[in-house]
Structure formats: structure tokens, C-alpha cells
Amino acid sequence: MHCDVLWHNARLMTLDAGDGGLGSVDDGVVACQDGTIVYAGPAADAPPLQASHVHDCQRRWISPGLIDCHTHLVYAGNRANEFEQRLRGASYAQIAAAGGGIVATVRATRAADDAALLAASLPRLDALLAEGVTTLEIKSGYGLTLEDEIKQLRVARQLATLRQVEVVPTFLGAHAVPPGAQGQTYIDAVCQEMIPAVAAQGLAEAVDVFCEHLAFSPAQAEQVFVAARAHGLQIKIHAEQLSNQHGAALAARYGALSADHIEYLDQAGIDAMANAGTVAVLLPGAFYFTRDTQLPPIPALRAAGVPLALATDCNPGTSPLTSPLLAMNMAATLFRMTVDGCITGFTREAARALGRGNRLGRLRAGMQCDLAIWDIDAPADLVYRMGFNPLHTRVWRGHPC
């Protein structure tokens, strides 16, 4: 069999084991043709392979490229001053009353043109790529007007032309009520004007909504889901982060790809997600940064068979995090997730959360050849160590980059 590229003398995390674990292979090879894996597995079982380019991995570990399935990466402005204010005792309400909070990011994002927004976002993207990310989702939600939401989505797509990475854009117009607007009037505009325009221009694959007492009600979230479905867009939700609004169960009834945060999720929501195949996306960075104490119901989610993904939730207000490796450590330390669970959360299950489980997140024939090659002794090193980046090579669609 001929192939473009062959990586050999490697240890593999295939993420393709029947038991749902890492699918480790001690002496493995990965063969790629035209950006697609044609063989991944034990060297002893490989067919005869003739490669144009051969890489001796010298016993390094190869995993699928990491997937960050929940980010708000495209925004302008800096809210480090709010962090200082909170450390000095200011409340979120006091900061918001002084013009801070999400309104500050909305103001800065609206004021930035495409070039400025791109320049602000590229370093954050590069930080993710430096730790092995090959696919990421980017949400809008800091424009809150049709023009500015489209600007964010346009910049998200432009990022993918400047770096070797797959960007999955999500429309999050229902992130917050913009200053001076009335909630229901704004949601009507999201559903009647913004979603049709975003869909017509092909700017997003999915629609997200922040369903919470300080954002949008379940009834308003359902209105968004109906509009999304009518325009052929997938559904996601920020749910049960601060209280149980039963948003995850609602989203599951609409076949949502994922429900994210879910600290206050109840058993009915878990059951609904399990029945719908909706992925739980856990966001330990936000949990850590906001000093939350309400743990997501991980044992119950596992027992119900709900897939558990992880993400950085990169955003300026509650998770200014651009390190998937640190997010794994946070998930292990704060959520008591296993090493296997942390790694599957940023690979196989993250792919499912983006509707890409059929082509990303595993090493097997037919999958896209997105790889992360690591200088580590064991997979646990990816989760155990902090401030440590052992990435040797990132491979996107068969090309080392």
C-alpha cells in the first residue's frame, strides 16, 4: 500500500478502543494518504506500506489532534482590571454597574474593525495550536447586533485561512441582552433577523443560547431552537451554570449536539441528554476562575452513558484560558476526572460535541489525519503536569505544522 506519510516507532492513543478508553498501542504506526488515515495500529498488523515521507517517532506518543469544542476566542478589549477589582472585593454587580462585565467586551468588540479583531484573536489561537489543537469551535456573542455578530463570525472564518486549523463557527446572538434593549424584543430580532441572515450567508453551523435567570428564559431559548431548526442549523446551549433552568433537557428535546457547563443539572436533564445523545461539555476553567463550588454531576452522567467532553471556554470574563493541557489538569483536580476521561474529553468526545465524531478525534482508517505527537513517558503526563508543554509536532490533515 502506498501512502504520503508514515509515522512509525510510535506509541499510540487511538481513542478507538471498544472499552471507551485510550486504545493504547505500544509499537504503532500511522499511515496517511491525501490527508486521511489509511492505517493506525500495531506495526505487527500493518499491511506493507510504501511512504513518500517517513518519520521515526523514537517512541513518542501520538494522539488525535486536540479539539477545543467551546470557545469565545474572537473578541476585543481586556478585562484584567475587573479581575483586580474582584480581588479587592468588588462584586460582579458593582463592576457591571460601572460599565464593566460583558458590556465592556461588547463595547470593545463593536468598536473594533475586522483587522483589529483579527489581530487581537490570533495570539489566542496560536496559544491553543501550540498545545496541539487542530480543531476548535468559535462562538460569536459579543456583538449583539446583526452587523457585529456577522463581523465576529467572519473573523472566525478568516482565522482558519491564516493557520492550519479547522474552525467551527457557532452563532451565539442569544448571549446577553444588549444595553438599552428589552429581552423579548431582542430575542425576536435574533430569531427573525439574525438567524436567517447568518444561515443565508453560511457563517455558522450551529446556534447557541445562554439559558439562565440573568440571560434568557427556557421559553426564549426554545424560540431560538425553533428558528435554528427552521434554518438548518445545529443546536447547542449554555445550561445550568448558575441555576437549574431545565435548559439541557429542553435542548436535548431538540436534538442538541451539546449542553455546556451544567453544574446544576438534575437527573431529568441527565436522562434527556442520554436519550438524545447530547454531549455534556464540562468547562473547568470557568469553574476555577469564578470559584464555583457546585460540581457538575459527573458520576450520574457517566452512569447514564452521557459522553463527557472538555473545553477551555476561552473568554475574557470567566475563563481567560488558552491551555487545553491546564484545562485537563483542572478537570482532574477539581472534577476528579480520570486521565483517560480528560484525554477523551479533548479528542473523541469533543469531536462528538461538534458533530464531527465520524471523522475527527480518533486514530483509525478513514479519519482525518490530525495528530499531536508528544514527548512524554505516559499519557498521564498530559494531565499531571502544570505549566508544561510536551508537544513535539502538530499534524493537520497529514501535514506537520
Curated annotation (Swiss-Prot):
Localization: Cytoplasm
Pathway connected to this protein: Amino-acid degradation; L-histidine degradation into L-glutamate; N-formimidoyl-L-glutamate from L-histidine: step 3/3
A single Gene Ontology CC term: cytoplasm
Keywords for the protein's UniProt record, in alphabetical order: Cytoplasm, Histidine metabolism, Hydrolase, Iron, Metal-binding, Zinc
Residues that bind N-formimidoyl-L-glutamate: Y142, N315, G317
A Gene Ontology molecular function term of the record: zinc ion binding
Cofactor(s) the protein requires to work: Zn(2+); Fe(3+)
Recorded catalytic activity of this chain's protein: 4-imidazolone-5-propanoate + H2O = N-formimidoyl-L-glutamate
Matching InterPro entries: Amidohydro-rel, HutI, Metal-dep_hydrolase_composite, Metal_Hydrolase
Residues annotated for Zn(2+) binding in this entry: H70, H72, H238, D313
Highest taxon of source: Bacteria
Function text: Catalyzes the hydrolytic cleavage of the carbon-nitrogen bond in imidazolone-5-propanoate to yield N-formimidoyl-L-glutamate. It is the third step in the universal histidine degradation pathway.
NCBIfam families xrefs: hutI
Protein name: Imidazolonepropionase
Gene source species: Xanthomonas campestris pv. campestris (strain ATCC 33913 / DSM 3586 / NCPPB 528 / LMG 568 / P 25)
